[in-house]
Amino acid sequence: MDTTGASESSQPIRVNLKPDPLASFTQVIPPLALETTWTCPANSHAPTPSPLYGVKRLCALRATCGRADDLHAFLIGLGRRDKPSESPMYVDLQPFCSLLNSQRLLPEMANYNTLCDAPFSAATQQMMLESGQLGVHLAAIGYHCHCKSPFSAECWTGASEAYDHVVCGGKARAAVGGL
């Protein structure tokens, strides 16, 4: 019971009038394994060359978790039906990743007990052209794990859980009108 005399209905309603930059991205693209591994989250912030493609493919995962051990990752993309080649902006993915990492939502994942405190991050992958110019620049949701068997069946099960979590997070986000 409220003893201050103020009712819930007298509280201001906050409405975000900014356009939602992710509203047009209605498809979630299944996980793509990144062949790069990092020795700790701090090392994942700089563009890292691919072991298979060298500097022709660079990935910055930007993991923010508190664990200091090795990690490997997957990219989970967001797509548009009308413009399949368009990806969201990196800065627009950051608030969505914060939502996905919410300690209120992470326990919904079946593999919650094996997760670190922030398995989702706004990641980028860059492809270099033969001319040395930057070609494709893809911003996507990075999902990482610290399991001892990178890309094992258990690891892929976790990536599948992450995909489902992104789909559900997107539906929740849409229901409340974006972030």
UniProtKB/Swiss-Prot annotation:
InterPro entries, sorted: Herpes_UL55
Q: What keywords is this UniProt entry annotated with?
A: Host nucleus, Virion, Virion tegument
Give the family this protein belongs to, as stated in its UniProt record.
Belongs to the alphaherpesvirinae HHV-1 UL55 family.
Query: How is this protein annotated for GO cellular component?
Result: host cell nuclear matrix; viral tegument
Where it sits in the cell: the answer is: Virion tegument; Host nucleus matrix
Share an example GO biological-process annotation for this protein: viral life cycle
- This protein's superkingdom? Viruses
**Protein name per the record:** Tegument protein UL55 homolog
List the Pfam families hit by this protein, alphabetically. Herpes_UL55
